[in-house]
Amino acid sequence: MKKEIGGYFELEDFGGKEYYPNLYKVNLGRTALRWLLEGRGYTKIYLPVFLCESVTEACEQRGIRISRYQLDAELNVLLPRKKLGESECLYLVNYYGQLTDEKILAYQKIFGNIIVDHTHAFFQKPLPGVDTLYSCRKFLGVSDGAYLSTDAELEPEKKPLDHSMGRKIGRAHV
């Protein structure tokens, strides 16, 4: 383990090895989300009420309609159990590792289009056919970085930019 510096870990050197070498690599989780929303052509997303503002902002920047859903005491989705429309998706956050692979697959079977946010479950591997986002900063001593697992056809030249220094000097708007 690295030596702590003022409550933070120093930046890590991984010797050029990626934890998820076969996934898309982007600078931030919200960048991965915007890229995925564009690639899938979603026009509406169901977001939990307990959520980081940056996710909401990323959806708004893409012009995605947002509908909020409640969670029960065990962080289960409280929505009518039905397939979503082709251009709609459900955003699932794995807050404390409560989303097992079985539960994720059950949500996919019920709702169809889902996006799993493993920001707080970095080491839980992505499932085939399930769009999954990871943010490296929550678990690793890196300044930025995120992974995206998807089988969607994504166009690299359309990758949205995200100016992460906006966190330091106020919000940067893309």
Where are these regions (language model features)?
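PLP-dependent aminotransferase-like
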Residues: 5-19, 23, 27, 31-109, ...
